[in-house]
Amino acid sequence: MNNKINNIKITQVQSAIGRKYDQRLILVGLGLNKINKSVILANTNSIKGMVEKVKHLLKIENM
């Protein structure tokens, strides 16, 4: 069986200044803290849920 999990590249494109506290915590949980910083994460349901809450601050690319 091929159980390969796809990855996604997430880049922060807007600042967290002036955003709700929970949105800031989500960015930290994703490993983002500066504009134009990118991380590559597994495309799991928990990551998808976090990305959905702050998608207006991010650029998402499938890998």
Swiss-Prot record:
A Pfam family annotated for this chain is Ribosomal_L30
Q: Which GO terms describe its cellular component?
A: cytosolic large ribosomal subunit
Give the source's domain of life in one word. Bacteria
> Which cysteines share a disulfide bond?
none
UniProt keyword Ribonucleoprotein present: yes
GO terms assigned for molecular function: structural constituent of ribosome
Note the InterPro entries from the entry.
Ribo_uL30_ferredoxin-like_sf, Ribosomal_uL30_bac-type, Ribosomal_uL30_ferredoxin-like
Keywords for this protein: Ribonucleoprotein, Ribosomal protein
Q: Which GO terms of type biological process are on file?
A: translation
Does Ribonucleoprotein count among this protein's keywords?
yes
Task: Please report which protein family the annotation says this sequence is part of.
Answer: Belongs to the universal ribosomal protein uL30 family.
What the entry lists under NCBIfam families is as follows:
rpmD_bact
Q: Describe its partners and assembly state.
A: Part of the 50S ribosomal subunit.
* Designated name of the protein: Large ribosomal subunit protein uL30
